[in-house]
């Protein structure tokens, strides 16, 4: 099922930046917010509690990648924060991903729904050349992504983070219900930044993405609220 709200990546260094940004929006508007490593390492759980207290959904983007026991215990803790989605690196392997899900299930308070758990396949900043030269994965980028997606599905996770360019083949290799969350989304004419594989909101919708993540085109816009609504309208067109 496609989420009708673009996920806003709040890649800010300070908690105060989050407050300043969210205060621009009408209090009645429920957003879907992505909180990443830098912000969580700086502000800790309080930033999650704050965003949730405003009625927004939270994707906590920490990309866990460690031994299974460590990931399981970490997910047990993260589940208590009330987040709506978390992630791991698929490169950690099936055993690690199974442990992550087990930790989430055990840590989710009674009466609450377990946070969605997705895995990163290849980062959108990774080109095939980088993958082959640095990671020594000597397949095509597409083959690597599909393999990771299949391993993620095998582990029982809800979906993957992937480029919109791979969505159709991932769903064909897993299932239509398998979530594809796609970063690297840029409105027509926007700068690509450090993203190698990008797509517009309209293109991502057409190709079957379930969630899109948009950061700088919203957070660095002259009018973030107007930019958000324009991207949301394009995504839902």
UniProtKB/Swiss-Prot annotation:
Supply the EC number(s). Answer: 4.1.1.23
Q: List the disulfide bonds.
A: none
Catalysis performed (reactions): orotidine 5'-phosphate + H(+) = UMP + CO2
A Pfam family per the record: OMPdecase
Per UniProt, the keywords (alphabetical) are: Decarboxylase, Lyase, Pyrimidine biosynthesis
- What is the uppermost EC class here? lyase
Q: Which GO terms describe its cellular component?
A: cytosol
> Pathway membership of this protein?
Pyrimidine metabolism; UMP biosynthesis via de novo pathway; UMP from orotate: step 2/2
What GO biological process terms does the UniProt entry carry, in alphabetical order?
A: 'de novo' pyrimidine nucleobase biosynthetic process; 'de novo' UMP biosynthetic process
- List the Gene Ontology MF annotations in alphabetical order: orotidine-5'-phosphate decarboxylase activity
TM stretches of this protein: none
Q: Which domain of life is it from?
A: Bacteria
Q: Do you know which SUPFAM superfamilies this protein is assigned to?
A: Ribulose-phoshate binding barrel
Q: Which family does it belong to?
A: Belongs to the OMP decarboxylase family. Type 1 subfamily.
Could you give the subunit structure recorded for this chain? Homodimer.
Function summary: Catalyzes the decarboxylation of orotidine 5'-monophosphate (OMP) to uridine 5'-monophosphate (UMP).
Name of this protein: Orotidine 5'-phosphate decarboxylase
Native species of this protein? Lactococcus lactis subsp. lactis (strain IL1403) (Streptococcus lactis)
Q: What is the lineage of its organism?
A: Bacteria, Bacillati, Bacillota, Bacilli, Lactobacillales
């Amino acid at each position: 099922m496609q989420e009708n709200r673009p996920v806003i990546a709040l890649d800010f260094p300070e908690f105060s930046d989050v407050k300043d940004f969210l205060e621009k929006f009408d209090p009645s508007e429920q957003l879907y917010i992505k909180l990443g490593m830098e912000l969580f390492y700086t502000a800790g759980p309080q930033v999650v509690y704050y965003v949730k207290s405003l009625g927004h959904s939270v994707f906590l983007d920490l990309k866990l990648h460690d031994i299974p026991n460590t990931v399981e215990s970490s997910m047990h803790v993260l589940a208590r924060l009330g987040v709506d989605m978390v992630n791991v690196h698929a490169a950690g392997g099936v055993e690690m991903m199974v442990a992550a899900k087990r930790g989430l299930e055990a840590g989710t308070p009674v009466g609450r729904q377990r946070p969605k758990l997705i895995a990163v396949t290849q980062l959108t900043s990774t080109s095939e050349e980088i993958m082959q030269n640095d990671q020594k994965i000597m397949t095509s980028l597409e083959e690597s992504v599909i393999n990771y997606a299949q391993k993620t599905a095998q582990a029982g996770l809800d979906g993957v983070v992937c480029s919109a360019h791979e969505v159709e083949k991932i769903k064909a290799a897993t299932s239509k219900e398998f979530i594809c969350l796609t970063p690297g989304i840029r409105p027509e004419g926007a700068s690509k930044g450090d993203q190698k594989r990008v797509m517009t909101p309209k293109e991502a919708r057409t190709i079957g993405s379930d969630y899109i993540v948009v950061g700088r085109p919203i957070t660095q816009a002259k009018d973030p609220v107007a930019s958000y609504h324009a991207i949301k309208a394009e995504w839902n067109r």
